[in-house]
Amino acid sequence: MRKADVIIPTFKPGDKLEKLLRRLLEQSVPVGRVIIMNTEEKYWDAERFESLFEGEDTKLTVCHILQSEFDHGRTRHEGILKSDADVCICMTHDCVPYDRNLVKELLEALDASERVAAAYARQLPAADCGVIERYTRDFNYPAVSRLKGKEDEDELGIKTYFCSNVCAAYRRDIYLKLGGFTKKTIFNEDMIFAGHAVEAGYQIAYAADAQVIHSHNYTAMQQLHRNFDLGVSQADHPEVFGRLHSEGEGIRLVKKTAKWLVENGHALLMPQLVMASGSKYAGYWL
C-alpha cells in the first residue's frame, strides 16, 4: 500500500485539532508524517500538540508562517512539497476522522484506477449540526462512492469537479505533474485542481467509506461572505468553471431541501432555508 503523509493548515488551533491528531495516530494504516502549516507561531501550543507524537512512529513537522503569507492554494502546496510520500492527504484542522479506517479507505479509493488523481472523504454532520445543514451534508456527501471523469460531465455537471480539502488524498506524482494547487486563491483550490485533473483525463474518486465529522452552522452573513469568496474564485478560473455552471446544482439543492423539510415535519424552517439560500445567492453574484 502507498505511503501517506497528512498536510494540515492551522490557525488558532484548539480541541478539534487535538482530537484530529489523536485519531490520526490511531489509524489502521499509519501515516508517515503529519505536516502542520501553522499561521502565526504565537497561536501554536507546542506542548499540547507536539507531545502527542512522543514515542510514535508517525512524525510531526510544524512550519510557521505569517498570516499575510497564508493562501489556501500556496500554503497547502508548500506543505505537499515538504513531503516525499506517495500520497498527500489534505485536511482542515476542524475535521475529525470518524473511525480508524479513514486513511485505509482513501488509499483504496486512489488505487481503484490508474486514472484516479484524488479521492475525497464523506463529511458527516457533527452533533450540534442544524437540520438544514444536516440535509445539505447528505446531499453533497451521499452514502455511495463513485468515480468521476470527463465522461460524466453531461450527467453530473459542475459536481464532476467537486472535491473537498476538508479531507482529500492526492497522488503526489500526478499532483506535481499537473502543477499542484493554484498558488493564489481565496477559496476553491481543491475544485480548481480537480477540474484541471479531469480535463487532463484523470478521475476524482468520492470515497463514501472514508468519513470525517465536519459541519458548520453559518449565519446568513457568514454564508454571504463564503459564497462571495466562492464566486470570486470561480470567476478567476473560467477555464474550469466557464463551461459547467454551479447555479443549477444550487437550485436543485434548494428544491430538494424544501421538499425534505415539508415531508419530515420541519416546514417551520422554510423561512430559514429562504434566508440562507438568499444569502448564498447574493454572495455568489456580488
Q: Predicted segment positions?
A:
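Short, well-formed alpha-helical segments that are part of the catalytic scaffolds
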Residues: 13-26
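Short beta-strand/loop segment that forms part of the nucleotide-sugar
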Residues: 32-41, 65
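Glycine-rich, basic loop-to-helix element that forms the pyrophosphate-binding segment
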Residues: 66-83
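Short beta-strand-to-loop acidic/aromatic patch adjacent to the donor-nucleotide binding site
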Residues: 86-96
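Conserved donor NDP-sugar-binding/catalytic core segment of glycosyltransferases
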Residues: 101-133
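A recurrent flexible, glycine/aromatic-enriched loop bordering the glycosyltransferase active site
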Residues: 150-170, 186
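Acidic donor-binding loop at a coil-to-helix junction in glycosyltransferase catalytic cores
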Residues: 186-193
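Non-catalytic, C-terminal membrane-associated alpha-helical segments of glycosyltransferases
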Residues: 226-232, 236, 240-286
